[in-house]
């Protein structure tokens, strides 16, 4: 495999940025660009990073050898200052050397291909990163630690243990030994099915990471939608202006509050306009109402006609009305709105945020130990069905060849969970959901 690199931190100005590089031969460049002879792996070195045009930055460098790295290949990481010019220069240098840009999940994919992680552990890396709740993070980390895969491998061995008696009964049917009865096949299958059902129940299945919930702010121009958007974020993400029609596109970001995570979307002020760009923004806002999970109509005065129009578009989804700018002498009866608040001063914001987060409350994890994806659940169902079908055939004295095939299919389902045999398309589906640099 080629040498690949990735920026593992966001591509925006910050205090630091981190680059990861992996692949056979990648350490050969260290003497030239860092003046560093690889001596002690997993040691932090402070060096000047030098490109063809001179010094790029004063950086930290750590390298890892082969099987002792995350990917199972020679690797190194660069910790530089987080300036855009510095990041661009480092990217240019790595491309000049001949390194390729890594794809999504490339580093974890290589870790799986080099037998550093099982497929279910690799998936748990993404689950841990995407977790927005502590209880979900806990079960994802349990899976990442290998407990989930170890249990699946254990059940696979037990399936093989039963299957060998069934196969023995087929291959040595003329022997005096009764492989089915003396081997306790039916009893073993009954216990196996019960234990496997208990294991499946110990897995937390969540669609939380598959479909992010969204809250859309709509309303007339200059009602304070962008100010409310920024207030929920805690920083200025959307442009705020006294001029109507400032927001012309959808602006999206994510909020984590009270153990709930949801996306918030600022939209163009809704009004009739001849400005083509603003008109397009209004159409975007109205169209987004059908897709959002919660619609929040923001006003700075009573507007019954627009309120009714927006409520009709929201259909049966939660529709909340907000009277903003209560710090001013607004022309509105607070009693006809769900919330009265000030995005500027923060008055009334807590009650509003609590309401939104309560709409997205998730089922608690409870005593469940592992994180299971929908892919795993489908395979678990297939495995349990195959085990039960095999037991039914054996109890009925039917063709043991078919019972043995059911047991083989049960084992295949378990192998697919941990990635004993995987197709390129499956790996693509899994790792394309990862972020770049992981």
Name every feature range the model reports, one short phrase each:
Residues 1-138, 142, 146, 320:
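A glycine-rich (often HGG/GG-containing) alpha/beta subdomain
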Residues 2-11, 134-256, 273, 291, ...:
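C-terminal-of-GTPase-core extension/linker across diverse P-loop GTPases
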Residues 75-78, 250, 267, 301, ...:
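Generic detector of well-ordered alpha-helical packing
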Residues 264, 298, 322:
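Generic enzyme active-site microenvironment
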Residues 12, 24-25, 65-69, 83-85, ...:
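Conserved nucleotide-binding/hydrolysis micro-motifs of P-loop NTPases
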Residues 278-301:
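Inter-motif core of Ras-like GTPase G domains
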Residues 46-65, 245-273, 294:
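Switch I (G2) and immediately adjacent beta-strands of P-loop GTPase domains
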């Amino acid at each position: 495999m080629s040498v690949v690199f990735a920026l593992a931190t966001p591509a925006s100005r910050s205090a630091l940025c981190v680059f990861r590089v992996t692949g056979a031969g990648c350490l050969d460049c260290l003497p030239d660009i860092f003046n560093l002879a690889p001596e002690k792996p997993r040691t932090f070195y402070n060096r000047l990073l030098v490109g063809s045009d001179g010094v790029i930055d004063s950086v930290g460098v750590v390298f890892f050898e082969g099987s002792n790295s995350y990917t199972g290949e020679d690797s190194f990481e660069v910790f530089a200052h987080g300036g855009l010019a510095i990041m661009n220069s480092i990217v240019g240098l790595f491309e000049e050397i001949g390194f390729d840009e890594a794809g999504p999940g490339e580093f974890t994919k290589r870790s799986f291909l080099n037998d550093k992680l099982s497929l279910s552990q690799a998936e748990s890396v993404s689950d841990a990163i995407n977790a927005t709740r502590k209880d979900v993070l806990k079960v994802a980390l349990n899976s990442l630690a290998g407990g989930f895969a170890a249990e699946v491998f254990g059940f696979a061995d037990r399936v093989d243990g039963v299957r060998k008696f069934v196969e023995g009964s087929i291959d040595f049917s003329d022997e005096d030994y009764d492989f089915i009865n003396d081997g306790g096949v039916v009893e073993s299958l009954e216990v196996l099915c019960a234990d496997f059902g208990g294991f499946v129940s110990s897995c937390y299945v969540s669609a939380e990471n598959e479909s992010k919930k969204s809250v859309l702010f709509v309303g007339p121009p200059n009602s304070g939608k962008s100010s409310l958007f920024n207030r929920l974020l805690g920083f200025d993400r959307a442009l705020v202006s006294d001029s109507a029609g400032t927001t012309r596109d959808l602006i999206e970001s994510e909020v984590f509050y009270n153990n709930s995570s949801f996306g918030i979307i600022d939209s163009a002020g809704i009004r009739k306009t001849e400005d083509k760009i603003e008109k397009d923004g209004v159409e975007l806002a109205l169209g987004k109402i059908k897709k959002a999970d919660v619609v929040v109509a923001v006003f700075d005065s009573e507007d019954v006609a627009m309120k009714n129009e927006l409520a009709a578009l929201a259909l049966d989804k939660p529709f909340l009305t907000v009277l903003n700018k209560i710090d001013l002498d607004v022309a509105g009866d607070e009693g006809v709105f769900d919330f009265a608040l000030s995005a500027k001063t923060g008055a009334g914001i807590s009650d509003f945020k609590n309401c939104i987060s309560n709409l997205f409350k998730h089922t608690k994890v409870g005593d469940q130990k592992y994180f299971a994806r929908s892919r795993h659940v489908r395979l678990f169902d297939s495995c349990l069905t195959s085990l039960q079908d095999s037991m039914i055939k054996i109890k009925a004295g039917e063709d043991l060849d078919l019972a043995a095939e059911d047991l083989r299919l049960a084992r295949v389902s378990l192998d697919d969970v941990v990635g004993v045999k995987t197709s390129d398309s499956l790996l693509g589906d899994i790792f394309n959901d990862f972020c770049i640099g992981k």
